[in-house]
Amino acid sequence: MARFRRSRSRSRSLYRRRRRSRRGGRQTRSRKLSRSRRRGRSRRRKGRRSRRSSRRSRRRN
């Protein structure tokens, strides 16, 4: 039972770290202002455009 408990605690910690890293990555733009902001904005804009285009195509069909 001890082994299972340890494995569960480790898996939970890994998931928490991954979630924190994602949220922190968005907030830690202060470290690399120009690079991270330009990349993030371009990716977000592309994603929004694709979503809008998909919605329009569905309505037309």
From Swiss-Prot:
One of its GO terms (cellular component) is nucleosome. It is found in: Nucleus; Chromosome. Keywords: Chromosome, Developmental protein, Differentiation, DNA condensation, DNA-binding, Nucleosome core, Nucleus, Spermatogenesis. Its main location: nucleus. GO terms for biological process: chromosome condensation; sperm DNA condensation. Belongs to the protamine P1 family. The keyword Phosphoprotein does not apply. Disulfide bonds: none annotated. One of its GO terms (molecular function) is DNA binding. Testis. It comes from Ornithorhynchus anatinus (Duckbill platypus). It comes from the Eukaryota. Protamines substitute for histones in the chromatin of sperm during the haploid phase of spermatogenesis. They compact sperm DNA into a highly condensed, stable and inactive complex. This is Sperm protamine P1. Residues 1-61 are annotated as: Disordered.
